[in-house]
């Protein structure tokens, strides 16, 4: 494992250093006592065999009971502090990953699929939490137990301890073979989890389409195949790992037979002078401790190898540097809603061959209403995404309020810009809670006023609980038109300097669309309004209309000017006026 990855996770211990260190101390104390218990047990056995004084036997017995109680207490405390440390560690990792994702630009997000990020935040972090718990408990306990037990076995058993020269290499070799065989399957599982989660996410998001095309059986089979792939890999890995137990039992029984057979002969031939019954008893216990510690080490190896893949995946997110950052001395106030594009060209990645936008020169005065029309794939949305700096331009500059957007504090800039998308998102909670994303301190009267302007107040009041009605995740219990109007109301509550509507009235009828635009003129006259639309009726009263074609502005002007100068605009207008506009709410 690379030191950089380890360093990334060590930082996440933070305020849980104390329980982590206490866990290590308790484990060391527990192991030390556990290793001493067989030593005193040997004395007790010999004393009983020799018919020693009862008081002395009771004294040794009480010492053993006290040691067992202290060992139990240390083990319990180690479990408590270890659980606290590992849970806190996992919480910090989860929080750090989530915080990092929140800072990502779209370019960063594009490197990871949504399903992959969900897997890293859940399954991968759970694996790392388990690994952390094993490291601070078993990974300390097993090596200490192994070393201390071998030392005590040679002190107590002498020649008998040579059994470990045979047993340990056999067990180690077997455990290494088992781990080497199981690891590829465990690694494959995590990659397949991403694909499984992608399938689940896609199915849930597109449930209406799935049911509309009666594709439930196909989706079940698709999910079943992905699930079976994971099952097969896990089954193979678990079958291999299951060989741990029989291998362990074989070594334990071999050790017992060797110690009892050779030890008994030594007692008989030496008359108990070379070795005694108590020593044989302790040798059996030390042998068990040595072999158990080796099995624990093998379990740690398997678990850490599994977790290593998870750690790498989490570290990829934590070490991913956000492409968009604040400058050293950011501007923290937006003067007005004016927007300037100066020789702007843009492509989504440095390696891309084609520019999504090219040669954009545009001035939008503060408070103006600008309409943008164009066919699918003409980069209308890309153009407006440069204003709140969701992406950085490849060439040229974008200015808001006369200042390059790259010079602003990101939060300040984005707080001054409200964007309403065609497929905007509502979050699980009440309507009030969703609306207050625009202004968390908005009064009930302000909520109602914004909703009246967005033509949402009537349908909200028709719900049994009104503004306290619950919105399901993603807004699945409201229609497309209702969702768009709620999102527009949310944006109005923000009272932004720039309002961007990205085809966000596509699901409402033309009358409602006109009423919403009339509300903009009365409620936010000083706000710059940029409206992307497919319907000419949605933008014909704008101060300026842009016609986009192939990532360029092919024409601009008022409605009347474009009817005269732009063939594309005139053609769209004639098609819509002749065919009629039949969009319904």
Language-model segments: which ranges?
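An intracellular "coupling" helix at the cytosolic face of ABC transporter transmembrane type-1 domains
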Residues: 15-17, 103-107, 123-132, 136, ...
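Alpha-helical transmembrane segments of multi-pass membrane proteins
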Residues: 19-20, 67-86, 137-144, 165-191, ...
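Juxtamembrane helix-loop junctions of ABC transporter transmembrane domains
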Residues: 2, 25-26, 33-46, 67-114, ...
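Membrane-integrated ABC transporters
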Residues: 1-34, 41, 47-64, 78-82, ...
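ABC-type nucleotide-binding domain
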Residues: 333-585
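Short intracellular "coupling" helices and adjacent cytoplasmic loop segments at the cytosolic face
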Residues: 50-51, 87, 95-119, 123-125, ...
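Transmembrane helices of ABC transporter permease
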Residues: 15, 19-32, 43, 133-189, ...
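Helix-loop-helix
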Residues: 52-56, 148, 152-166, 236-313, ...
């Amino acid at each position: 494992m690379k030191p950089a990855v380890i360093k990334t996770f060590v930082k996440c211990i933070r305020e849980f250093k104390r329980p982590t260190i206490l866990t290590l101390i308790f484990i060391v104390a527990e192991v030390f006592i556990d290793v001493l218990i067989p030593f005193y047990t040997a004395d007790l056995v010999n004393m009983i065999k020799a018919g020693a004084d009862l008081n002395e036997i009771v004294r040794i017995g009480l010492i053993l009971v006290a040691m067992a109680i202290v060992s139990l207490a240390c083990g319990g405390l180690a479990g408590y502090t270890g659980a606290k440390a590992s849970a806190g560690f996992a919480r910090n990792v989860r929080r750090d990953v989530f915080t990092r994702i929140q800072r990502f630009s779209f370019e960063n997000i594009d490197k990871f699929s949504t399903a992959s990020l969900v897997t890293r935040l859940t399954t991968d972090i759970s694996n790392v939490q388990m690994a952390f718990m094993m490291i601070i408990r078993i990974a300390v306990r097993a090596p200490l137990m192994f070393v201390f037990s071998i030392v005590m076995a040679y002190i107590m058993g002498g020649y008998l301890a040579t059994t470990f020269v045979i047993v340990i290499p056999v067990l180690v070799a077997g455990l290494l073979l088992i781990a080497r065989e199981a690891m590829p399957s465990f690694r494959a599982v995590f990659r397949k989890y991403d694909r499984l989660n992608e399938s689940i996410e896609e199915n849930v998001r597109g449930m209406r389409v799935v049911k509309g095309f009666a594709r439930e059986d196909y989706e079940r089979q698709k999910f079943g195949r992905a699930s079976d792939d994971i099952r097969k890999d896990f089954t193979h890995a678990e079958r291999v790992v299951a060989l741990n137990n029989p291998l362990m039992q074989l070594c334990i029984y071999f050790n017992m037979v060797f110690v009892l057979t050779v030890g008994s002969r030594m007692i008989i031939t030496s008359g108990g002078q070379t070795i005694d019954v108590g020593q044989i008893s302790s040798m059996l216990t030390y042998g068990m401790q040595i072999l158990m510690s080796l099995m624990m080490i093998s379990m740690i190896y398997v678990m850490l190898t599994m977790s290593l893949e998870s750690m790498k995946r989490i570290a990829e997110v934590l070490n991913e540097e956000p492409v968009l950052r604040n400058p050293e001395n950011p501007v923290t106030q937006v003067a007005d809603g004016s927007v300037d594009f100066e020789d702007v060209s843009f492509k989504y990645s440095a390696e891309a061959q084609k520019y999504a936008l090219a040669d954009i020169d545009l001035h939008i005065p503060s408070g103006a209403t600008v309409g943008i029309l164009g066919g699918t794939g003409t980069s209308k949305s890309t153009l407006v995404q440069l204003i709140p700096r969701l992406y950085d331009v490849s060439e040229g500059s974008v200015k808001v309020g006369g200042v390059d957007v790259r010079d602003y504090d990101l939060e300040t800039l984005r707080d001054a810009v409200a964007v309403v998308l065609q497929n905007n998102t509502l979050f699980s909670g009440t309507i009030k809670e969703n609306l207050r994303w625009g202004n968390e301190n908005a009064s009930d009267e302000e909520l109602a006023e914004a909703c009246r302007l967005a033509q949402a107040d009537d349908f909200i009041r028709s719900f049994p609980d009104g503004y306290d009605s619950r919105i399901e995740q993603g807004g699945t219990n409201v229609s497309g038109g209702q969702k768009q109007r709620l999102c527009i109301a949310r944006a109005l509550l923000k009272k932004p300097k720039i309002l961007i509507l990205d085809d966000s009235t596509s699901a409402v009828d033309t009358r409602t669309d006109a009423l919403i635009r009339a509300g903009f003129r009365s409620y936010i006259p000083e706000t710059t309004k940029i409206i992307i639309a497919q319907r000419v009726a949605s933008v014909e009263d704008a101060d300026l209309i842009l016609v986009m074609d192939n990532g360029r502005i092919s024409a601009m002007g008022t409605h009347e000017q474009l009817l005269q100068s732009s063939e594309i605009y005139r053609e769209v207008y004639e098609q819509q006026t002749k065919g009629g506009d039949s969009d319904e709410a």
